[in-house]
């Protein structure tokens, strides 16, 4: 997991060859001005989702993980708190290959991070995360889905 400010995103380009495409997209587009929806940046290898997320309490948020895609999550309006756990420490969970997701509904969060507006969090396959923890009823966020290579 990586937590940093957007101005530093380019420093992480060496972690995945597709990260440079994400960086270039963010430098040429104002994410806050994009309409809700899905944007294919490079086929299914790099996809951006702008979505209206529903705020959850810490007890409502459920851990999830992905095997094929890396999540780069960016709160666009205000900070967002996200629960964390290492997948190696979690019990086996059903996996949907179609949606590339496993849920861990009865597993405890090990830690929390708060991503500020102007920041981002990168979640790799080993990083289970419980997103959308916020006191606000709803908020807008950007999620880049980047294929693991």
What is each PLM-predicted segment?
Residues 52, 125-127, 133, 144-148:
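Short, structured patches in soluble enzyme cores that scaffold and shape functional sites
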């Amino acid at each position: 997991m990586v937590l940093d400010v957007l101005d530093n995103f380019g420093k992480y380009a060496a972690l995945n060859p597709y990260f440079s495409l994400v960086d270039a997209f963010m430098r040429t587009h104002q994410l806050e001005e994009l309409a809700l929806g899905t944007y294919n940046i490079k086929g299914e290898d790099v996809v951006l989702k702008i979505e209206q997320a529903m705020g959850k309490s810490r007890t409502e948020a459920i851990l999830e993980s992905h095997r094929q895609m890396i999540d780069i999550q960016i709160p666009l309006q205000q900070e967002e708190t996200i629960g964390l756990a290492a997948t190696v420490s979690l019990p086996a969970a059903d996996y949907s290959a179609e949606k590339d997701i496993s849920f861990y509904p009865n597993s405890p969060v090990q830690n929390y991070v708060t991503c500020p507006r102007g920041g981002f969090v990168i979640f790799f396959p080993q990083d289970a995360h419980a997103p959308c923890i916020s006191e606000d009823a709803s908020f807008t966020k950007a999620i880049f889905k980047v294929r693991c290579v």
